Swiss-Prot record:
Function summary: Catalyzes the attachment of tryptophan to tRNA(Trp). Amino acylates tRNA(Trp) with both L- and D-tryptophan, although D-tryptophan is a poor substrate.
Organism lineage: Bacteria, Pseudomonadati, Pseudomonadota, Gammaproteobacteria, Enterobacterales
UniProt GO molecular function: ATP binding; tryptophan-tRNA ligase activity
Gene: trpS
The protein's name: Tryptophan--tRNA ligase
Organism: Escherichia coli (strain K12)
Residues that coordinate or bind L-tryptophan: D135
Amino acid sequence: MTKPIVFSGAQPSGELTIGNYMGALRQWVNMQDDYHCIYCIVDQHAITVRQDAQKLRKATLDTLALYLACGIDPEKSTIFVQSHVPEHAQLGWALNCYTYFGELSRMTQFKDKSARYAENINAGLFDYPVLMAADILLYQTNLVPVGEDQKQHLELSRDIAQRFNALYGEIFKVPEPFIPKSGARVMSLLEPTKKMSKSDDNRNNVIGLLEDPKSVVKKIKRAVTDSDEPPVVRYDVQNKAGVSNLLDILSAVTGQSIPELEKQFEGKMYGHLKGEVADAVSGMLTELQERYHRFRNDEAFLQQVMKDGAEKASAHASRTLKAVYEAIGFVAKP
């Protein structure tokens, strides 16, 4: 039986965090045996905000090495860089003509980003969700692992696919969201009611996957908990957001359930919890970084992974693009 196709991607425009790892990358790794996984480094999305060219090139290779270090296996999955597969931009343009201005105007991420990058509100930033739809629909994707912040974009992808299919027949699979049961959201260390973000200006809120583990220990020990007396280590997102966040992180790293951890820390101080979280996270990062540096220092291997991945992706993408071009009436290239 053919495995369902999963597509997902991440920008190379900033260092990945443990939030990215626990909320996305680890799920990607776990899906490799049961699904046909296609994972993309979306460098074309990254340039919707200004990038330094040298830094972008470095960040792309860094991100690829991190994917591999986290356990994404090029023998099991297709891993590639978006700009290496021109069908993404080609389908993106075609889908622009089947997407309405009003739909894009309602995208909350555009509103947020245009406020943050007021000096550079470019058409690419506005049009970002259409390229994302092309990314997904090119591969006849069945499932897309999405966080809450991308659900609206996936809904638009589904709408575009259904609109196109209604006009031309079943050209696209209509993708479904895949939302993991747990580990999907790691919150900010000092503001635990908001999601941890690699673009956060306050670096004390964020744990980067490539950060010095000693620095991470200090950050975790400064993390917000609670002011109750005596302290109670209990999972309660509404009333104990900081404590709950630390329990979520510890559970994700160790594999222990939340009830097991609550029992383990019964009668203990918040300092005990922070110490355990710090030890677990720093240990995990030390091992991950050793693997990362091994891959990052072998640039010939990274180049081969990108080349092989782009060839596999393009073989799949070109079939979809050919069907789209034929449906809309383009003359086939001689």
